[in-house]
Structure formats: structure tokens, C-alpha cells
Amino acid sequence: MIISAASDYRAAAQRTLPPFLFHYIDGGAYAEYTLRRNVEDLSQVALRQRVLKNMSDLSLETTLFNETLSMPVALAPVGLCGMYARRGEVQAAAAADAKGIPFTLSTVSVCPIEEVAPTLKRPMWFQLYVLRDRGFMRNALERAKAAGCSTLVFTVDMPTPGARYRDAHSGMSGPNAAMRRYWQAVMHPKWAWDVGLNGRPHDLGNISAYLGKPTGLEDYIGWLANNFDPSISWKDLEWIREFWDGPMVIKGILDPEDARDAVRFGADGIVVSNHGGRQLDGVLSSARALPAIADAVKGDIAILADSGIRNGLDVVRMIALGADTVLLGRAYLYALATAGKAGVANLLDLIEKEMKVAMTLTGAKSISEISGDSLVQELGKSLPAALAPMSKGDAT
């Protein structure tokens, strides 16, 4: 199979993975309206083509939180990453490390902090949820700090799990889910051998280390469902600061006022994100939300963005809309499931090449030269008909 884009990796991953795993990462909340809009809105951001600009000294390098990145991209935290390839977090982190960009380990990773961090040359980032069990949160923060993690990504858009219809249909949840997953694995022998048998243990490593006992998929679903904390508030940031003195990024911002609050409460960065369309359907796409947020806080706080990014052109679009750096989620999971570390490394090479093409043809020699001036029109200020506000009929 010829691989020339993230879409090719998606097609390959769908063939390789048991359906419960493919649809877990591929799906979104409710009718998946926001999931689709993330991609569609971003694809309609028009860039100004500029020519005869002597682009021979083009550079993608940037700096974030005193770290030098080879390009303005980081790998996002993804739960159960180690179910998509054998010790998947270790493989994905190695690809990011070799490329000179950060890898973010999820709270609910298969591989624990202590397994991933020692394999890397550069410090990784760690993602944390607000959970009812504050003892676990403190333990995770202390372990992340001891392992040399440089940046904390604090996810705030999951006070409760989203309603993900696909999960019930695919076998991730719902009636007879464990039996359905078993038979799906049997029907996908490549995955069953590489990950199902040789990728053990399939614990949630960070949680198992705290609880002192193995945790499987059913524990993952049950433990998280019982521990997400709807009482989360901005004061939780103050509590976290007692145990974390490094850069802290608030992930899950879609409103300018929340972005301003993040500045007021001392966050170092925000991620403009709707959780890849996996939490509340019908909210703004990240591309649509980003310009107003950038207008509100650009220069006061680092702005990262995710959701809908599938190629290097999308990275340039997000930066033109106001982001400093982007996070890749689904795209790298597809590559990881298809070819492990080599797949992620190849995807990052493709994104780098695509960014260079886009920057060359828009006359931007450096990341700092990509701005609103690079746009034909800024998304959300002069919307074409396809991006008009959702009507009542669209919501049904």
C-alpha cells in the first residue's frame, strides 16, 4: 500500500485494528457533528499565495517553554495508546524524540511514566485529568516530576465522559462488550499477535502503579467513570501549583473568557481544543474558535491547538489563525497502528514536508512570519456559506 498522507494511515489502521479500537479513536460524541466540522472548517481556511520571495533559508524551528522544537508540533496525549501497537507509548515517544518534538503521555496510558521517560533524550510532557482521587493526582504529579517531565498538560474538558455512541456499537462498551472484543481480536491476527499477546501487560500503567494492582480495560472504563470530578474549578489550578512548578498548559479551551481566566490564574499555555469532537457535540470547531481566543490572549500566554489537523498544511493554517504550536492526536495513532515507530516517524516527515511546501508558497520563511496576514480571510470573521452558524434544523 502506498502511504502519502494521514488518510492512507487511517485506511490501513481500519484494516489492522479490531473495530472496538479503531472506532474508539476514530469516533466522536453523539452524532459526530463537531468531529466532522473540525476537519471541514480547517480545510476551508484559505491562504494567500506569495511568489518570488527567495525561500532558500526557510526554517520550521520554534521555541516553546524554553524548549527548541524542530517544528511547531507535539504529539497529543491519547489514552490506551499502548493498545494500538506493542508498547505504543514507547514507540510513539521515540519517533517524536528523534524528530525533536515533544511527546505527551496520557494519565490513562498503557505504559507508565517510568517506562517511557528513561527511553528519551528530551523531556516528555505529562497530561493529567482532575479526578476525585486527589491522592492519585498528587502521586502522578510527583512521579512525573521525578521522571523529568517538563510540561504539565491539564485537561479540563472532561468533568464527565462524553456520550460516544460508536463505543456501544463497536464493543468498547455496551452489552457483552468483553466477548465482542475477544472475537474481534481473533479476527485480526496481526494485532492479536503483536499487541494482544506480545504487548502485555495491558494495564493502565500509571493507575496500576498507584493502586498497586493490575488494571485492565474494564477497570479503565469503571475507574474513570467513578473518578471524573464535576466539581472542577479554576481553584484546582492553585492546588496543582503546590505540587508542580514547571510550565502548565490548560487543555480544552474554546471560549475567549476561559482563555482570559487561564491567564489570570497563572497558566503558561492553553490548548484550544474540543477534545477531537469526543466530548460535547455541536460546540465550535477549534479552527472556528481559535481567532477570537488569539485576539483575546495572544502574547499573554502560549496558544496551542488541536482537533482536525491531518497534514502539514493544516498546521500552517492553525498557526495563521493564531496558534503557536499544534498537537497531533488521531493522525499519529493511525500511523502507529499501521507501522509502529516507523509509521509515526514517516508521518512526521510528511507533515514537515507539507509545511515546507505551504510556507514556501505563502512566502513565510519562519514560523513567526505565519500570521493573520497569511490568510485570504480569517475563519469566523467572513464566513462562506458552508461555515455559516448551525441552524436549528442542523442540530436535529
UniProtKB/Swiss-Prot annotation:
One of its GO terms (biological process) is lactate metabolic process. The keyword Flavoprotein applies. Keywords: Cell inner membrane, Cell membrane, Flavoprotein, FMN, Membrane, Oxidoreductase. Belongs to the FMN-dependent alpha-hydroxy acid dehydrogenase family. PANTHER family: L-LACTATE DEHYDROGENASE, S -2-HYDROXY-ACID OXIDASE-RELATED. GO terms for cellular component: plasma membrane. Pfam families: FMN_dh. This is L-lactate dehydrogenase. It catalyses: (S)-lactate + A = pyruvate + AH2. The keyword Metal-binding does not apply. It is a peripheral membrane protein. NCBIfam families: L_lactate_LldD, PRK11197.1. It is found in: Cell inner membrane. Its cofactor is FMN. Substrate binds at Y24, Y129, R164, R278. The active site is at H275. Residues 1-380 form the FMN hydroxy acid dehydrogenase domain. Its EC number is 1.1.-.-. Catalyzes the conversion of L-lactate to pyruvate. Is coupled to the respiratory chain. The gene is lldD. One of its GO terms (molecular function) is L-lactate dehydrogenase activity. FMN binds at residues 106, 127, 155, 251, 306-330. CDD domains: alpha_hydroxyacid_oxid_FMN.
